[in-house]
Amino acid sequence: MIRAEGVCKSFDKKEVLTDIDAVFEPGKVNLIIGKSGSGKTVLLKSLIGLHSIDKGKIFYNDRDITVMNNKQIKDIRKELGVVFQGGALFDSLSVLENVKFPLNLFSSMTEKEKTERAIFCLNRVNLNNVENLYPAEISGGMKKRVAIARAIVLQPKYLFCDEP
């Protein structure tokens, strides 16, 4: 379970998150709805350890991530799939290399196993035979599906989607 308690975050003295409490359980769908600029992305990035918070606590399976070092947070991140708003694909990597990227960071699979897993995930999002193309060569919708394939390649316990 991921739990936020009293989370506050400011940028340049402008409070973006004010006393946020939330619980996210594996297998459950949660929506965070708000106006543009209301802090949805900041909350997501805080929940996965990409943003520090000013006040409050964020727990992952009852472990306080707000006091963890980068290595400890990295160990947790392999259980979190994230699709960022812009997709965050690497333009210099092929579709296949983009999807394999988390496997290269977090997996001890062989290169053949990584390729098979990445192609399996591409097929899950209905992207067949595009693995050798580059992000500039595919449509915006296809880029979003590549980002989803990359987010699920590690079989995460949680999948966060920012503006899916």
Question: Would you name each region that the model predicts?
Answer:
Residues 134-138, 142:
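Conserved ABC ATPase signature
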Residues 93-101:
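Short coil-to-helix segment of the ABC ATPase nucleotide-binding domain corresponding to the Q-loop/switch region
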Residues 148:
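Hydrophobic anchor residue at the start of the ABC signature
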Residues 153-157, 163:
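A short, proline-enriched helix->beta-strand linker immediately N-terminal to the Walker B motif
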Residues 48:
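Helix-to-loop junction immediately C-terminal to a conserved catalytic motif
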Residues 56-64, 76:
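Conserved ABC transporter NBD signature motif
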